[in-house]
């Protein structure tokens, strides 16, 4: 059974990273169960292994963490719900395929958005979840993962109601044309974060 670990306060990125890695080590050693961390971060820009220095435009006194996930720069902060699955793709009928895993994370987000009558899509040659609006295509969720001995860590960040202005300090995912959005912006209303977390938990088990 996958253990859900919900952090009730915006957590510093480095602290959450240590928790992920500790759980990964425990799974490898047979001393810990699989887990999904569900949380919000304190303001932070994270740089994946493909990030370039010129993609950080202005950090606005926001900390920058270089990390070992795939991808480039992104922003995390309050109002953005993140799930970090630390699960073994070699067990429980799962598929040992990184692309399949990333696609499943995207499907999880797309399915969760349906509860708000929002149609999420994936776009060829990109990673993440997007929406098509009257103002063009916008990104609503970012995915960045790493897999060690078929155990996953890092995960997906969904913009529920973050401060979208803070994305202006970076070139999101290395694409200057990327425009970000959130559930709250699309619906023009406040979103209950606990309600959305419950949806993610429910939909997770339909896929994983």
Swiss-Prot record:
Q: Name one Pfam family in it.
A: LplA-B_cat
Q: Which InterPro entries match?
A: aa-tRNA-synth_II/BPL/LPL (IPR045864), BPL_LPL_catalytic (IPR004143), Octanoyltransferase (IPR000544), Octanoyltransferase_CS (IPR020605)
Record keywords: Acyltransferase, Cytoplasm, Transferase
Site Lowers pKa of active site Cys: which residues? 139
Pathway listed for it is: Protein modification; protein lipoylation via endogenous pathway; protein N(6)-(lipoyl)lysine from octanoyl-[acyl-carrier-protein]: step 1/2
Any one GO CC term of this protein is: cytoplasm
Question: Reaction(s) catalyzed by this protein?
Answer: octanoyl-[ACP] + L-lysyl-[protein] = N(6)-octanoyl-L-lysyl-[protein] + holo-[ACP] + H(+)
Which EC class is this protein assigned?
A: transferase
Q: Does the keyword Transferase apply?
A: yes
Q: Which residues form the BPL/LPL catalytic domain?
A: 30-208
Q: Where does substrate bind?
A: 69-76, 142-144, 155-157
GO molecular function terms attached to this record: lipoyl(octanoyl) transferase activity
Localization annotation: Cytoplasm
- Which residues constitute the catalytic centre? 173
Under the heading HAMAP family, the entry gives: LipB
Its function, per the record, reads: Catalyzes the transfer of endogenously produced octanoic acid from octanoyl-acyl-carrier-protein onto the lipoyl domains of lipoate-dependent enzymes. Lipoyl-ACP can also act as a substrate although octanoyl-ACP is likely to be the physiological substrate.
The family annotation for this protein states:
Belongs to the LipB family.
Q: What else is known?
A: In the reaction, the free carboxyl group of octanoic acid is attached via an amide linkage to the epsilon-amino group of a specific lysine residue of lipoyl domains of lipoate-dependent enzymes.
Name assigned to this protein? Octanoyltransferase
């Amino acid at each position: 059974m996958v253990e859900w670990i919900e952090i009730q306060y915006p957590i510093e990125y480095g602290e959450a990273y240590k928790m992920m890695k500790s759980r990964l080590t425990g799974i490898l050693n047979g001393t810990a169960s699989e887990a999904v961390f569900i949380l919000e971060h304190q303001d932070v820009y994270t740089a994946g292994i493909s990030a370039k220095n010129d993609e950080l435009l202005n950090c606005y006194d926001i900390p920058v963490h270089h990390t070992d996930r795939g991808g480039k720069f992104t922003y995390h902060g309050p109002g953005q719900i993140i799930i970090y699955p630390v699960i073994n793709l070699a067990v429980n009928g799962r598929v040992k395929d990184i692309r399949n895993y990333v696609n499943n994370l995207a499907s999880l987000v797309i399915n969760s958005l349906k509860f708000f009558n929002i149609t999420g899509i994936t776009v060829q040659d990109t990673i993440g979840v997007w929406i098509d609006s009257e103002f063009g295509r916008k990104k609503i969720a970012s995915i960045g993962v790493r897999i060690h001995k078929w155990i996953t860590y890092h995960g997906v960040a969904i913009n529920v109601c973050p401060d979208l202005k803070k994305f202006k300090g970076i070139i999101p995912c290395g694409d200057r044309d990327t425009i970000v959005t959130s559930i709250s912006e699309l619906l023009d209303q406040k979103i209950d974060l606990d309600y959305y977390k419950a949806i993610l938990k429910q939909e997770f088990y339909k896929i994983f």
